[in-house]
Amino acid sequence: IRRQRQMCIRDSGICIAGYPVTNYASNVILRFLRFRMGNKECVHPDGADALGGKGARNVIIDHCSISWCTDECASFYENDDFTMQWCIISESLRLGGHTKGPHGYGGIWGGEHSSYHHNLLAHHDSRNPRFGLGAKVRKNGECDGDYVDFRNNVIYNWGMNSSYGGERMNINIVNNYYKPGPATVTGSKRGRIFAIDATENRSGGYLWGKYYIDGNVVDGGADDKNSQKATANNWEYGVYNQFSNNYKKVVTQKTKDSIRLDKPHEFASVTTHSAFNAYKQVLDYAGCSLHRDDVDARIVKE
């Protein structure tokens, strides 16, 4: 974009709207920007993310507000050394024109040595997030790539599904705050921290990832037994109790022991709060918060 004269941006800053934004460039920082795509101008709603990117290295997404997509609001995978922090990812368009029908999804998150912390995911049917492995081939079925650290995030008002996926990935899920809302389904999914998936190998068995999960809180209110149990015992009720029917007959105690880690995967240090403190910090500071607009203010209030 070549301008012929000086441009002054006043008040609330920059909002990019109308079409998807995709980053394939390395050594990039995006900070204090809004991405509110919508479905009025985008002519190809399938695969249209408000903000996404893959195949890059050394990328930071910081204090951005991302919403109103027709596929996922924010999907980042197949990146190396990636950080998404202090962002608000909200209100995917469930009926935005995707050819598969209802499609209000938060994002697919992955990458090698990727950190996702202090983000707010609000009002998505599913993929809050969906942890997704990149296309790189894994030797001998071992988990030798895609190390993801997911901590101090707030997940609010998921519909049918909160976090899931993670096939053959190495993931820390630490001190996150899950809060069911009006759209959240009843039953055990109200206590869902993470529904683990696996990859089927050629011999008919399954290849699992390695996960460290601790300190997560599910706040469903005083009368919600599912969320209370998941908070008290993250693994038993927030994870083991969340396997899909496809796996329930094949998940043995040996499987459970093999996927559960007693120590977290090593990552660069991130200032880590308790789940309760993270909830307050994220609501106070996440998103394009130097000048918080009416959309983000409403999401936070809700």
Put a short name on every predicted segment.
Residues 20, 50, 72-73, 95-96, ...:
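Structural detector of coil-to-beta-strand junctions
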Residues 10, 26-39, 55-68, 80-98, ...:
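Right-handed parallel beta-helix
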Residues 4-9:
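Short, small-residue-biased leader/transition segments that mark boundaries at the very start
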Residues 2-3, 18, 178-302:
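Long, contiguous C-terminal flanking segments immediately downstream of a protein's structured core
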Residues 45-47, 71, 75-79, 99-102:
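Short, surface-exposed recognition loops or helix-turn segments adjacent to catalytic cores
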Residues 2-3, 14-32, 37-57:
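Extracellular beta-strand-rich solenoid/capping regions of secreted or surface-exposed proteins
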Residues 39-44, 70, 138-139, 186-187, ...:
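Extracytoplasmic/secreted cell-surface and envelope-processing proteins
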